[in-house]
């Protein structure tokens, strides 16, 4: 699809430790609201696509018997494995594969979450596969946050200019394509809601 935004492969290579340490967590109220809406059985599966270091998988794990934490970056899934071992979270399965290449049977998941990553995926393909992976009555949640660094305040504008200047100096300004932060409100021709349920 010509209008799709493409990200450089390996964009997060080597960043897992920093991502785990500095990535802001999702608010507890959001996690609780998501669990309330999806009303998991406690016996089902959660799929966290493009999971990073498990910012959604870990806080949601208590509502599921099994959690698949999937990310294309090996460093991210290594951190997930280490965190799961340290927490004694045997139900968390870290899988190193892209969302587009994941092989999962139909109707396997009660809830699928994608946190701050749907814009980086091949959206129509992933949306189609997600629909098949959800069990009847299952839910898809596209979780999003805004950057605390972006905004109209003087310090935010100054930081933005500084980051852009360093991107130019380091030759990385083209790694993130323009428009990545405006994913739109549709997937193909399907409107996106806050939380979608498979009927």
Give the residues covered by each predicted segment.
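N-terminal, positively charged/glycine-rich alpha-helical extensions of SAM-dependent methyltransferases
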Residues: 1-15
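Residues lining the SAM
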Residues: 114-115, 143
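Class I SAM-dependent methyltransferase SAM/SAH-binding core
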Residues: 47, 53-101
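A short acidic, Gly/Pro-enriched loop at the edge of an enzyme's catalytic core
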Residues: 103-112
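A short, conserved alpha-helix within the catalytic core of class I
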Residues: 121-130
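Conserved catalytic/acceptor-binding region of the Class I
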Residues: 131, 135-199
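Conserved alpha-helix/loop element of class I SAM-dependent methyltransferases that forms part
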Residues: 24-44
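Class I SAM-dependent methyltransferase Rossmann-like catalytic core
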Residues: 13-24
